[in-house]
Amino acid sequence: MAFAEVSTYSNSSGSGVGSLTVTVSGAVANNLLVGQITVRNGGDAFTTPTGWTLIDTHSTGAFGYATYYRIASGTSADDAAFSWTDNGTCYAAVVEYSGNATSSVLVQSSEKTSDLGSTVTTHTTNSLTPTAGNLLLAALAVLHNAGWNTPASQTTTVSSPFSLSDENTTASGSQPYAAIAYYETPDTTTRAATFTTNDAGSEPASVIMEFAAAAGGITGTGAITEGADTSAGSGAIFSYI
């Protein structure tokens, strides 16, 4: 396996704010960082954090989210300072992966918003046909955490072969729910990720992304620890209402 999940960093706010910073401490230079911000009752327009590249953003006026990526520098410049218009409760996360290319790393992405306005318990992303050996990431943003995943002990599942990298399991109903899942593709089979909850359900949206692998294998250095969590605050991923 060329790709590996290295660390997850997150932050959240249960009160209405217009900005939130995720501190990325100890990221390995040249690793891939993917950040997601989700805002409830706000987030009409997001400002791209310095040094990050926008992948996708969407707003309904009551809920908004944005997804970004950057190649890690291994310095404090990796911190993700998210900001947006219209204050709201929020969750944000940054996930670090190794094994990526360091240029032209984002291959393709596809957003799905057709479940917004509906109350569902299952959401399937759009499908992508990847290059063998690349990384697929699926980022889920849900309007209201109380409907999608309550209490925190009832975790959301993602369909095989995807695995969850991060999710907001600690937020109250006033915060949005968000999750990020990943899969390293062994072939060119067209794939989508399905997120499921056994709760009442809510209004989800998603973006699925493909990232290129390094030509010579893993690019970062240092030990890899599966899902090491350095969360701050009450926790949040990247979704907004």
Where are these predicted regions, by residue range?
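Primarily extracytoplasmic/secreted proteins
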Residues: M1-T221, G227-I241
